[in-house]
Amino acid sequence: MAETLSGLGDSGAAGAAALSSASSETGTRRLSDLRVIDLRAELRKRNVDSSGNKSVLMERLKKAIEDEGGNPDEIEITSEGNKKTSKRSSKGRKPEEEGVEDNGLEENSGDGQEDVETSLENLQDIDIMDISVLDEAEIDNGSVADCVEDDDADNLQESLSDSRELVEGEMKELPEQLQEHAIEDKETINNLDTSSSDFTILQEIEEPSLEPENEKILDILGETCKSEPVKEESSELEQPFAQDTSSVGPDRKLAEEEDLFDSAHPEEGDLDLASESTAHAQSSKADSLLAVVKREPAEQPGDGERTDCEPVGLEPAVEQSSAASELAEASSEELAEAPTEAPSPEARDSKEDGRKFDFDACNEVPPAPKESSTSEGADQKMSSPEDDSDTKRLSKEEKGRSSCGRNFWVSGLSSTTRATDLKNLFSKYGKVVGAKVVTNARSPGARCYGFVTMSTAEEATKCINHLHKTELHGKMISVEKAKNEPVGKKTSDKRDSDGKKEKSSNSDRSTNLKRDDKCDRKDDAKKGDDGSGEKSKDQDDQKPGPSERSRATKSGSRGTERTVVMDKSKGVPVISVKTSGSKERASKSQDRKSASREKRSVVSFDKVKEPRKSRDSESHSRVRERSEREQRMQAQWEREERERLEIARERLAFQRQRLERERMERERLERERMHVEHERRREQERIHREREELRRQQELRYEQERRPAVRRPYDLDRRDDAYWPEAKRAALDERYHSDFNRQDRFHDFDHRDRGRYPDHSVDRREGSRSMMGEREGQHYPERHGGPERHGRDSRDGWGGYGSDKRMSEGRGLPPPPRRDWGDHGRREDDRSWQGTADGGMMDRDHKRWQGGERSMSGHSGPGHMMNRGGMSGRGSFAPGGASRGHPIPHGGMQGGFGGQSRGSRPSDARFTRRY
């Protein structure tokens, strides 16, 4: 219990600061938006049971509001305070390593806000704007605390509800004095509600620590009754704890604090050891105070807050109680704010001791958070002897006096300046107990200020002299002493009331003895003043556990409602506020002790990150697999698309080839069709020609048949008679003379029939020749011996014929018997046709016949002329000459040399057709 209470005191102080920073303005919020702390605060206002989980609390509150006739969906609460406390609670769950404090803060946030506001006003008096701790240790603590808070938030709420029930049971058993003290504490808390919310802790770590601390303080104040079991524990543990404290002294407390920090922040252990060597005396005093606080958790946190404000000589009992609570707050802030600083819990003790000098009980509080984590050790410390508690009181007073001049403000800081920078800067001129960088939360973007606590006032003065108006990070800084006296006076008033309370409770003195032992150790280290020691002893006596808690609350109500505690480890003032409902908080503080022990087994920050890392890696792997799968699908789709395109191209190429083949086939068929058409035309032409030739042959045959019919009687007569009859000879002569003397005997031919068949001269020639050959036989070749002799023979023949004819005409004798005129006529026809065939020149031109006629007339003798006419009519006997001419008419020749009845048939059809 003592440990829990001390832890609550620390966290309560920090929480008070956080809550006070939040304004107490009221606003409407939905029931579902309220946190467990808010729900319990509303239930407490309505005197309704506030134990149970969130769902049960919401049901109760809803029913209570409906009974009042209000709207359960909209509840009027201090909205700003709640919001800010919620922030800090989430952050302050970082210090939940000291889980006890955090739980208390959560439940009592409503009450704690009032106390915090009052303490914040004190901070304003000290010119503190928002406290934001930048120390390395504090930062580390914050991160660890966050992890712890996340893991144990649910457990804390449950433990808080259980602790409330336990506290209620204890309350009944507690002596009336304790109840009175609790009542006084509530009054003090109500007074503190007026505190301003100007200052807000900037640093996340510090803020979270403040809220849980505040809640713890509220629990301690409201549940002074709970201190009764603490008294029992303290009585049991007094002897062993006294032995432990006497033997170990500050070291034991440092070890406990280290354990606490290690549970919450395993890294802090090493730093704690380092700081332990530097501030061994201070840490010992703080440890002793913490032991007292642990014994009387309910009273001490409240008193500690008030005493923190008091720098010097107030009633020792009051100072110690207030200082213990304030120190608890400061320590909780340190734990939350300085993860790096946390590694040195002992160093914090030393720093807290420095603050205790400023505010007599400051030292008590810092060990309280450490001891809250190590609740068992705290219980043992409760059993320390009363003498030790008296010694502790003296040391606290000395510390408070000395700490008054150890604090100073640094203004004009750069926005990049951290608490570690200040610590490094001022450590050149002495040991820096604590350093913080704060700003005004109400005005965002406000300038930052530094609050530094040195181990001694001389070192602080040296720092002010050397570093005032110097440059840091490109900015001119001014260093001025902090004014802590008004707060100290208020805490002294509280201590007076606490002193009265101390007299009323004897059981608390056992815990005070334990504190005295611790104070003795601290006195050895810091050589505290005797007066302050006496005050601390008185305070220890007054605080026999829960009774001290009640006294602290009473003193707080009597003194200033707001108390500022100097966080000596960080050199920053911390506001501690006490709120109503402290009774329930006391039970919560016990639960928090157990929670803090559980938190000792809190996993490290890396372990907390491991599942997150694994989840991230899994998500990354899933994303990577999904992207790879998409890429594979894309590649497959592209491949299939390429294949489809290739197939389509092949199909198109095949179609083009097929079309080309078809086109070529069509062209071939067209060519064949044209060829066939051409052949068909040629065939038609050939057939036409054959038909025409056949018709011509028929005509020629007809003519030839008619001609022999006309000529046959003459031939028969000539053949039958060896000599021509006289009549015929006379007629023949007459005809010859008339025919050959007549110049135009060939001009009566029908020229229209002459070119009737010009294209078929060759056929006609052949046909006529064949017919003549058939008709006339083979007499010509036999007589004339071949075509080569034709010209001469014919000429000779014609010449002879002509001479013979003339002679016959002149003599009147028949022609010589050797000549057969009929045969000769036939032979002449053959000869003439033979010459025509040899020359290949058949011309039916009438002019040629005329020329022939003229040439014939120009010669002597009709026979000669006939022969020459035949030749000249052709113009040439070249074999390849044009063969357009007609063969010489048979009848013409015959008539030429025969003179046979030429005049009787001058217009014979044979002449026309022949030409």
From Swiss-Prot:
One of its GO terms (biological process) is estrogen receptor signaling pathway. There is a cross-link at residues 172, 186, 381, 392, 483, 514, 543, 570, 578, 847 (Glycyl lysine isopeptide (Lys-Gly) (interchain with G-Cter in SUMO2)). There is a cross-link at residue 578 (Glycyl lysine isopeptide (Lys-Gly) (interchain with G-Cter in SUMO1)). Its main location: nucleus. The modification N-acetylalanine is found at residue 2. The modification Phosphoserine is found at residues 24, 55, 79, 195, 197, 209, 383-384, 415, 580, 582, 601, 604. Ubiquitous. Expressed at high levels in the CNS and at low levels in the liver. Expressed in a wide number of breast cancer cell lines. The modification Asymmetric dimethylarginine is found at residues 868, 874, 884. Residues 225-234, 293-309, 346-359, 390-401, 477-551, 559-570, 581-641, 749-796, 817-832, 841-851, 905-915 have a biased composition (Basic and acidic residues). Residues 67-77, 98-118 have a biased composition (Acidic residues). Residues 275-286, 371-383 have a biased composition (Polar residues). Residues 892-901 have a biased composition (Gly residues). It is found in: Nucleus. There is a cross-link at residues 231, 294 (Glycyl lysine isopeptide (Lys-Gly) (interchain with G-Cter in SUMO)). Binds to scaffold/matrix attachment region (S/MAR) DNA and forms a molecular assembly point to allow the formation of a 'transcriptosomal' complex (consisting of SR proteins and RNA polymerase II) coupling transcription and RNA processing. Functions as an estrogen receptor corepressor and can also bind to the HSP27 promoter and decrease its transcription. Thereby acts as a negative regulator of cell proliferation. When associated with RBMX, binds to and stimulates transcription from the SREBF1 promoter. Monomer and homodimer. Forms heterodimers with SAFB2. Interacts with KHDRBS3. Interacts with CLK2. Interacts with POLR2A, SRSF1/ASF, SRSF9/SRp30c and SFSF10/TRA2B. Interacts with isoform 1 and isoform 2 of SRPK1 and inhibits its activity. Interacts with RBMX. Interacts with FUS. Interacts with ZBED4. PANTHER family: SCAFFOLD ATTACHMENT FACTOR B-RELATED, SCAFFOLD ATTACHMENT FACTOR B1. This is Scaffold attachment factor B1. It comes from Homo sapiens.
